[in-house]
């Protein structure tokens, strides 16, 4: 069981929703079906979420720091600025988004 502060849980809901929408809209063009999955890990000091798909992957020149995608800019801001975490997007048999966030030592607001 994982109990998260309400703000962290809300941020993660937005992030996961946005990543799934990106997979559906951009990853499976011209295909009838595809796979989207989510893997989570907990460590003593944080959480790792990895959302993945088996779609066409990111463009060769993709750069998260230079993206014009509003959704990805929002994700980047939520992860880094609001939750003090890190995000990586990379190709591996489709697209993978790896998000690492620290645990809140105070427990946050519920």
Which residues are covered by each model-predicted region?
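Conserved short strand/loop->alpha-helix "switch" segment adjacent to the catalytic nucleotide/phosphoryl-transfer site
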Residues: 1-20, 24-36
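Short beta-strand/loop element within the Bergerat-fold HATPase_c
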Residues: 33-45
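A generic structural signal for beta-strand entry/edge sites
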Residues: 44-48, 94-96
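Glycine-rich/acidic phosphate-handling loop/turn and adjacent ATP-lid/helix
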Residues: 46-73
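Conserved glycine-/histidine-rich ATP-lid loop and adjacent helix of the Bergerat-fold HATPase_c
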Residues: 74-84
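Glycine-rich ATP-binding loops of the HATPase_c
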Residues: 83-90, 96
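Short C-terminal beta-strand
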Residues: 94-105
